[in-house]
């Protein structure tokens, strides 16, 4: 019997027969014991203050910021430890009332790739321990780490502070390596081993979806009793239809009657923006008349240090003969991104893997349907035929066909847009924070019980 916290109707279970969880699990997670007063949240490789869509900043940054704010709103103080990336950063920044960001010096400030960060975990851990040393015992009630790098720091911190560790993978090496894009680099064995160690050390694991929970059990041997599913949320105050598509297009200088398939996110093979470019080329070959009324914005920057430009994508657009309809735009603020969502006819997400797909929920909250690959958590984020269209595989011709279908059927596009806004209303950060707080309470109760048994 395994427990899954789900914002979509409380706790959900599925029958797996002899699969990962061995049967249905409908028991409601009991709210027992106290919630933490203050937690240490760890995000080694990317700061919640960074602009999403740049470098390694993306959905995880949004996740941490929104979750921390909502936890603070229910009286759980959050201190976020992250690596300092410039020498001008103050030691601490108040992100919101009850949310403090602590910058930790670990390695050179600039030009350090994520792949080089394992060598800096000792320095980062030293900084975290140094910040804690000035506090009384019991200052933090729990550690919540994000991504495998943070998990290793959290493992040591939780043991030193004698508090439970809650960990969120966000992405997993074994899953990514099983669905690599052409030309993408496999995740190293060191990461796989590191993730296996964290799974064994954590008191609770939070998965974005039931599928991710299954993957934790199937690929990493996680104890099903320690895995909780909490769907991420969306900021429904920021991401909403607002004054509509026409007004958003006017603000962005886009044609009022254009077909606008949008890509928004980091420019990396995993996100597959090249699939969209190939699909657009295929679409224009099939229906050359569309060239006069199609605009394809690609909003985002390259992964890593952010110093490189997405030159390969520019060259691909030129080679495919679609440079005239592609509009490359740099990463933008969350408020500006909301306008891009509203202006778009449809968001296209041909990713090879997504643990959830926050971008899909954000777009739908703005009333924009989504064409997405049927991978990872996207079948949860997108309701096929109601809020968008799920495409099996990554054949550009399949995406071109769906784009053509939407361009030829304004009624369908409108129905999907209405369904998208309705679907997104089910995903709010307040619910996600409440469910996460319940996981914390369970972790603390289990930790206290274990200590009472073992002394």
From Swiss-Prot:
Superkingdom field: Bacteria
Q: What is the lineage of its organism?
A: Bacteria, Bacillati, Actinomycetota, Actinomycetes, Kitasatosporales
Q: Which Gene3D superfamilies does this one have?
A: Glycogen Phosphorylase B
> Which reaction(s) are listed as its catalytic activity?
1D-myo-inositol 3-phosphate + UDP-N-acetyl-alpha-D-glucosamine = 1D-myo-inositol 2-acetamido-2-deoxy-alpha-D-glucopyranoside 3-phosphate + UDP + H(+)
Extract the GO molecular function terms from the UniProt entry: acetylglucosaminyltransferase activity; D-inositol-3-phosphate glycosyltransferase activity; magnesium ion binding
Quote the record's binding site residues for Mg(2+).
341-342, 344, 368
Role description: Catalyzes the transfer of a N-acetyl-glucosamine moiety to 1D-myo-inositol 3-phosphate to produce 1D-myo-inositol 2-acetamido-2-deoxy-glucopyranoside 3-phosphate in the mycothiol biosynthesis pathway.
Protein name, as recorded: D-inositol 3-phosphate glycosyltransferase
Q: How does it assemble?
A: Homodimer.
Q: Name one Pfam family in it.
A: Glycos_transf_1
Q: Which family does it belong to?
A: Belongs to the glycosyltransferase group 1 family. MshA subfamily.
Q: Which SUPFAM superfamilies match?
A: UDP-Glycosyltransferase/glycogen phosphorylase
Ranges for region Disordered: 1-25
Residues annotated as binding UDP-N-acetyl-alpha-D-glucosamine: 51-52, 59, 266, 271, 354, 362
The UniProt annotation places 1D-myo-inositol 3-phosphate binding at 45, 56-61, 114, 147, 171, 191
């Amino acid at each position: 019997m395994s427990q899954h916290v789900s914002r979509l109707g409380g706790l959900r279970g599925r029958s797996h027969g002899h699969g990962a969880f061995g049967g249905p699990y409908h028991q409601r997670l009991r709210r027992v014991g106290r919630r933490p007063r203050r937690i240490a949240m760890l995000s080694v490789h990317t700061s919640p203050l960074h602009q999403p869509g740049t470098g390694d900043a993306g959905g995880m940054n949004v996740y941490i910021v929104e979750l921390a704010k909502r936890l603070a709103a229910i009286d759980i103080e959050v201190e976020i430890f992250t690596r300092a990336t410039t020498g001008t950063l103050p030691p601490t920044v108040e992100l919101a009332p009850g949310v403090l960001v602590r910058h930790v010096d670990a390695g050179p400030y600039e030009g350090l790739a994520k792949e080089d960060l394992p060598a800096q975990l000792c320095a980062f851990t030293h900084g975290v321990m140094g910040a804690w040393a000035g506090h009384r015992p019991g200052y933090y009630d729990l550690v919540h780490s994000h991504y495998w790098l943070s998990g290793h720091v959290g493992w040591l911190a939780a043991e030193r502070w004698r508090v439970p560790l809650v960990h969120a993978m966000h992405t997993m090496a074994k899953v990514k390596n099983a669905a690599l894009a052409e030309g993408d680099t496999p995740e190293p064995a060191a990461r796989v081993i590191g993730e296996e160690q964290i799974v064994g050390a954590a008191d609770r694991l939070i998965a974005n979806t039931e599928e991710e929970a299954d993957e934790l059990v199937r690929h990493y041997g996680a104890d099903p009793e320690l895995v909780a599913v909490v769907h991420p949320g969306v900021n429904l105050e920021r991401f909403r239809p607002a004054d509509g598509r026409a007004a958003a297009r006017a603000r962005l200088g886009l044609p009022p009657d254009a077909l606008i398939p949008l890509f928004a996110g980091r420019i990396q093979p995993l996100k597959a923006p090249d699939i969209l470019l190939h699909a657009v080329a295929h679409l224009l070959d099939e229906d050359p008349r569309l060239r006069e009324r199609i605009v394809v914005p690609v909003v985002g920057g390259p992964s890593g240090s952010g110093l490189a430009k997405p030159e390969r994508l520019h060259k691909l657009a030129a080679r495919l003969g679609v440079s005239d309809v592609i509009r490359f735009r740099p990463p933008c603020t969350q408020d500006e991104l909301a306008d891009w969502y509203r202006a778009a006819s449809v968001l296209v997400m041909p990713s090879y893997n997504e643990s959830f797909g926050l971008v899909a929920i954000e777009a739908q909250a703005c009333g924009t349907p989504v064409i997405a690959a049927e991978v990872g958590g996207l079948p949860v984020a997108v309701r096929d035929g109601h809020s968008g269209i799920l495409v099996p595989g990554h054949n550009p011709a399949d995406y071109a066909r769906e784009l053509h279908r939407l361009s030829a059927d304004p009624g369908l596009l409108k129905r999907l847009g209405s369904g998208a806004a309705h679907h997104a209303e089910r995903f709010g950060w307040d619910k996600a924070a409440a469910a996460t707080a319940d996981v914390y309470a369970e972790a603390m109760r289990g930790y206290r019980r274990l200590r009472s048994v073992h002394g």
